[in-house]
Amino acid sequence: GENYWSGVIMLNVVLSCFLLLLVPVVGVGQNSPGPGIFALRTMLQDKDPEIRTKAAEGLGRVGGRESVLILRQGLTDPSLEVRISVIEALGFIGGRLAITVISEALKDNSVEVRIRAVEALVDAGTVSSIPVIQKAFGDKEESVRLHAALMLRRIGHRLTVPVLGDVVLVDKSPTVRAAAAEYLGKVGVKNLRAVGFLAKALEDKSPTVRIRAIESLGFIQLKQAIAVLEKGLQDSDPGVRIRATEVMGHVLAKDFE
C-alpha cells in the first residue's frame, strides 16, 4: 500500500543523496580511488536492480579507469535496465578503455542493449569508435545495422565513407543498403571514393537503393558524380529515371549558375 511506495520513494531519495555525496569524494585524484568508489562497486552487486542502476549512474559521473573496470562487471547483469545504464555510463565516461568494454555489449542477447551500445560508442569516442561500430554490421538484426549506419552519419567523418560504402554493397537488407547510400551523400561530400560506391549502388536490384544513390550523388559536388548520374537516366525503372532527371537538373543548375 502507501507505506510500501513511500518507503521506495524514501530509498530513492536517500540513495540519490548518497551518490551525490560520493562523487566529489571520488573525483579527487582519479589514480587513487577512495572508499566511495568501492561503495559504488558494492552497490552495483545489490539484489535490488534499482540500486544497481543508480550505482551505474554514479560510476558514470565519477569517471576514470577504475569506474570503467567496475562497470564492465555490470554488462552481465540479469536486468535489462541495469545493463543499459551500465552502457550509458561507459559512453558518458568515454575513452579507449570504455570503447573496448562497450564493444563487448554488441554480443548481448537483447536487441535494445546492442542498439544502446552502438549509440554509446559514438558518445565514448566519435572517430575512434568507427572500427568498433563497423562490427555491428555483422548483427543479425536489421534494426541494429540501421542504427549503426545512422551513428556513422552522426559522426560524419570521411573515415565513415569506406564503411558505409561496404554496407551499401554487401548488406542483405535493402532497407539498410538504402540508408547507407543516403548517408554517403551526407558524409562523402567532395569524396571520390563515395562516388565509386554510389556508382556501384546504381546496379543494386532494389529501386529504392538506386534512388537513394542518385539523391546522394546530387550532394557530392564533384564533376565525376555527374557522369554517374547520367547512368541513372538510362535506368530500367521509371521512378529511378524521374529522380535522376530531377537531381541532374539541380546539379547542373548549381554547376553553371
Locations of the language-model features?
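Bacterial N-terminal signal peptides
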Residues: 12-24
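N-terminal leader/linker segments that initiate helical-solenoid repeat arrays
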Residues: 27-61
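Alpha-solenoid repeat junctions
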Residues: 59, 63, 90, 94, ...
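Short inter-helical turns and helix N-cap capping residues of alpha-solenoid HEAT/ARM repeat scaffolds
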Residues: 47-48, 78-79, 109-110, 140-141, ...
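N-terminal, post-signal-peptide region of Sec/Tat-exported proteins
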Residues: 48-88
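Amphipathic alpha-helical scaffolding segments comprising HEAT/armadillo-like alpha-solenoid repeats
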Residues: 31-43, 64-76, 95-107, 126-138, ...
